[in-house]
């Protein structure tokens, strides 16, 4: 794309437009939501709104994030997923208030991830899935507050041991990578402490396909349980339900509800 050229349906973002896109989150934080607006270049005018707590530029046509993004010193939540970004700026390491970073579904390579990422000492969730990473950045091993890491759908053939030693890691997604040994990903995951928090959704909130998937999984669990014992047992996990597309912030965790009857 020629420098300065706009996308086919690009929208000019003015300061007035940006201000109209500010929302207040349920916990009183200020979010600037510029997602799905056909933006082709990072709008410089939003730097005048650098007091935002959250910034959503996802599902646009952005190719480059400028160093000036570090002016968002209060930012705790940055969503850049589904763009055309192939490199993150070194200045991202200065955004030490960040708790959540989503850069999935871009064109990032391992060389496009700066070592300055290791300065994000407070970050808890990073999603690097659906990119072109052929190795895991060693900087991730320095982020001791990480609870969730997404590395799915990349070009990885191994995972460094430092990732499994992250003290607070609860969820790691490394599915659909070309690991050379069958089952390597499962063995790696087994070395990590299991997820402690499970979330509940009601059956009425599930789409038909998700509900069928859950019911099939529940039936399979019951069959395995029945094969392991000769004594008739009460059905286990009567309300096992699977990932819900509506709960996007859960990173596709399984939800399980245990009820007594």
Curated annotation (Swiss-Prot):
<feature type="repeat" description="LRR 3">
    <location>
        <begin position="74"/>
        <end position="95"/>
    </location>
</feature>
<keyword id="KW-0433">Leucine-rich repeat</keyword>
<keyword id="KW-0677">Repeat</keyword>
<dbReference type="GO" id="GO:0035556">
    <property type="term" value="P:intracellular signal transduction"/>
</dbReference>
<feature type="repeat" description="LRR 2">
    <location>
        <begin position="51"/>
        <end position="72"/>
    </location>
</feature>
<keyword id="KW-0963">Cytoplasm</keyword>
<feature type="repeat" description="LRR 6">
    <location>
        <begin position="145"/>
        <end position="167"/>
    </location>
</feature>
<protein>
    <recommendedName>
        <fullName>Leucine-rich repeat-containing protein 18</fullName>
    </recommendedName>
</protein>
<comment type="function">
    <text>May be involved in the regulation of spermatogenesis and sperm maturation.</text>
</comment>
<feature type="repeat" description="LRR 7">
    <location>
        <begin position="168"/>
        <end position="189"/>
    </location>
</feature>
<feature type="repeat" description="LRR 1">
    <location>
        <begin position="28"/>
        <end position="49"/>
    </location>
</feature>
<feature type="repeat" description="LRR 4">
    <location>
        <begin position="97"/>
        <end position="118"/>
    </location>
</feature>
<dbReference type="InterPro" id="IPR032675">
    <property type="entry name" value="LRR_dom_sf"/>
</dbReference>
<dbReference type="InterPro" id="IPR003591">
    <property type="entry name" value="Leu-rich_rpt_typical-subtyp"/>
</dbReference>
<dbReference type="InterPro" id="IPR050216">
    <property type="entry name" value="LRR_domain-containing"/>
</dbReference>
<feature type="repeat" description="LRR 5">
    <location>
        <begin position="122"/>
        <end position="144"/>
    </location>
</feature>
<dbReference type="GO" id="GO:0005737">
    <property type="term" value="C:cytoplasm"/>
</dbReference>
<dbReference type="InterPro" id="IPR055414">
    <property type="entry name" value="LRR_R13L4/SHOC2-like"/>
</dbReference>
<dbReference type="Pfam" id="PF23598">
    <property type="entry name" value="LRR_14"/>
</dbReference>
<dbReference type="InterPro" id="IPR001611">
    <property type="entry name" value="Leu-rich_rpt"/>
</dbReference>
